Amino acid sequence: RDLVRSRGLGDVYKRQVEMDGFGVNEGIIVMAATNRVDILDPAIMRPGRFDRKVHVGRPDIGGREEILKVHAKNKPLGDDVDLQQIAQTTAGFTGADLENLLNEAAIVAAREDRAYIVQADIRRSFVKVGIGAEKKSRIISDKEKKITAYHESGHAILFHVLPDVGPVYSVSIIPTGAGAAGYTMPLPEKDEMFNTRGRMLQEITVDLGGRVAEELIFDDITTGASQDIKQATALARAMVTKFGMSEDIGLINYANEDDEVFIGRDLAHTRGYGEDVASKIDAEIKRIIDECHEEAKKIISAHKDVLDACVELLLEKEKITREEFEALFENRSGL
């Protein structure tokens, strides 16, 4: 560990000498980029070394459209391709994500022996970039398909019903290369500057939708919700320890953001609070998870007919679109 720290400091000193040396280098501008500015040595950041700091965030809708235009210049597009509409549906995408999106769409078009990209190609590549490649060759049993269909339908219903987290873009029971048995992909419709307590609670509720659907339908539960539970727990913990969203804990930051393992940093993690506070934090996290679990159970139980209809459609088609999913609710309202 001392050796790692020594090498890290050596690199810092070397860069400092290279930047200002023992004389003056006229006409030389030093530029650098990092996504971890918080761990940089202050000596590197002092005036005279890096005088101007520019934060480059994720592009907004206008920026995404301009980036798409750049990457579309060398790709023939069909008449139905609308770059503005694509920009609207790719909130949160980076420039690299958008480039990858069009590259994947071009591959889809080439595989279908087409000389140009159509909107359907982009829809397919959107899922691949957002979720990962589908592995249609993987064989799963009918029982596993049914469990997965109920699991994903549970997520989808909550995405649709809860006002701040939807709508659904695609629901699938086709396994992915990342190891998931299926996926439910939401469609962000606008850029968000910040999150709210209400929306975060809805996100946790959606995370628990798959497990709730399994509990309501089957006599047993599966390991398929492990990642969902991990996400829900992390979000609940952030609400309690980082964002001051727990009345019991109060407006105090207990998050250990500076304890991440990094080259040159101590590997030992320390906690800035005692066991009593730790117990309160755990209790608050459990309370949030339990309340969201009950909310998910209430909503899915009230939409049991849509749950069953969605499962039936998924078992028939394996993947359904937003329009097909929303039609299930429209048919329900007509009963």
Predicted regions and their residues:
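Single conserved hydrophobic/aromatic residue that forms the stacking wall/gate
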Residues: D2-Y13
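Conserved C-terminal "switch" segment of AAA+ ATPases
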Residues: G23-I29, P42-A43, V56-R123, K128, ...
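Residue-level signature of catalytic and energy-coupling elements of molecular machines
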Residues: R15, T34, F50, R64, ...
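Short pre-active-site segment immediately N-terminal to the catalytic Zn-binding motif
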Residues: K136-I147, E192
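Short regulatory helix/loop adjacent to the ATP-binding pocket of P-loop NTPases
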Residues: V37-R49
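A short beta-strand-to-loop transition that corresponds to the Sensor-1 phosphate-sensing loop
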Residues: A32-V37, P59, V161-L162
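Soluble catalytic regions of large protease machineries
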Residues: I147-A149, A156-L335
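Substrate-engagement module of ASCE P-loop NTPases
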Residues: D11-G27
